Amino acid sequence: MLKVFNTATLKKEEFKPIVPGKITMYVCGPTVYNYIHVGNARSSIAFDTIRRYLLYRGYDVNFVSNFTDVDDKIINRAQEEGVSENAIASKYIKAFYEDTKPLNIIPATTRTRATEVIPDIIEFVSDLIDKGYAYESQGGVYFRVRKAGNYGLLAHENLEDLEVGASGRLDDGALALKEDPLDFALWKNEPRQVIKWDSPWGQGRPGWHIECSVMSTKYLGYTIDIHGGGIDLAFPHHTDEMAQSEAHTGKQFVHYWLHNGFVNVNNEKMSKSLGNFTTVHELLSSYDDPMAIRFLMTATHYRRPINYSSSELERARVELDRIRTAYRRLKNADFKIGDDPQIDQLVSKQTAAFVEAMDDDFNVANALAAIFELVRLANSYVDSGDVKDKSAQEILRQIAELIGVFGISGLETKKESLPKKIELLLKKRETARINKNWQQSDQLRDEIFSLGYKVSDSSNGQQVRKI
């Protein structure tokens, strides 16, 4: 029996989909004004892992996510670079796909841009005005928070204790346009010569919160099974989504709210605003094992924070290599025809332990413990010298399938060995860098490049890949 921790109730609850065997799932996507950082990737990986487990359990998962492609940050970046907002958004949407592909994140069933649903947004906002939940003020439209009966549920705060402008997206002067400081923008008046649309209230653009409500309703229906995102989105973003969606439809918006924890650097949340972030784009260019990055992100329970560092990444790689090595040892062992019932029973026991762990709000620590029991079994089976082909294949199948729930692939693939000349040049370059002979270091880097290999320097040392 699958149980999930529901942020709305702060309890683990038995998971019961609206339609048996089918799951509707919405997860908030990035604002595309820059490359995604490791913290953004953590959310994508966490919910990809949850999605993979639901698929493993036999559910049909309809997974929808968004790109916020109209926002002050995008407008500001476009003005800085002298290009259109669409050019900025398109550039970083392309980068998102390029950066998430090596991390083995399954593409969403539907992934849409906010600018693609503007007519739907205008219709949604108009309905809220008609029902008295929203009002127009000088070309903008705002939601009446105090009219929503359960506002603040996800924040677990009284209405009076909620922080005005908690999203950090409150425009200067916006407070003066509101009936109540807690009211939030559904549609923003836009007098500048930037991206905007005609509406019944004048030219403007949507507020941040409305797009996810519209996309979820449009592609998944009035009520969905799971809504996910980072814990920082619980208030105000998801709180506002819930309020406006339930006001619009008169129905419960989400059955289960799931939120992932932060990625921290030196015990402080990684964020672009703090400047303590590492982009996935940078990391992938300097680190040659994307599956180790994925393993680091998925080996910690999704609700717990991760303290990111190069040493933690290296620790994750070492752990993953234990699985890879055991898998390859057994794969390449000498088999005898037949099976071993005792081995098969041990495999079944660990598979059941994996399911039991993941059914407990996706307890990856206990699930990994089951996988490592299979790893130990694989090694001891090879050491026994009496490996039966059917039992060996079952161990291999289960290791690959279970670690595949974590999104880890390529267990059979060995890292490509480097030509001896490249290895020699790398050693010379490492010596030059230790001696701070930067000129020689650069010359050796260029020589390596001329031979078809690119060298990047990182806190993990020299990383080299074939061009």
From Swiss-Prot:
Its EC number is 6.1.1.16. Binds 1 zinc ion per subunit. Its cofactor is Zn(2+). Keywords: Aminoacyl-tRNA synthetase, ATP-binding, Cytoplasm, Ligase, Metal-binding, Nucleotide-binding, Protein biosynthesis, Zinc. ATP binds at K272. Transmembrane segments: none annotated. GO terms for cellular component: cytosol. Its main location: cytoplasm. A motif ('KMSKS' region) lies at residues 269-273. A motif ('HIGH' region) lies at residues 30-40. GO terms for biological process: cysteinyl-tRNA aminoacylation. It is found in: Cytoplasm. The keyword Membrane does not apply. Pfam families: CysS_C (PF23493), DALR_2 (PF09190), tRNA-synt_1e (PF01406). One of its GO terms (molecular function) is zinc ion binding. It catalyses: tRNA(Cys) + L-cysteine + ATP = L-cysteinyl-tRNA(Cys) + AMP + diphosphate. Signal peptide: none annotated. Zn(2+) binds at C28, C212, H237, E241. Belongs to the class-I aminoacyl-tRNA synthetase family. Monomer. This is Cysteine--tRNA ligase. The lineage of its organism: Bacteria, Bacillati, Bacillota, Bacilli, Lactobacillales.
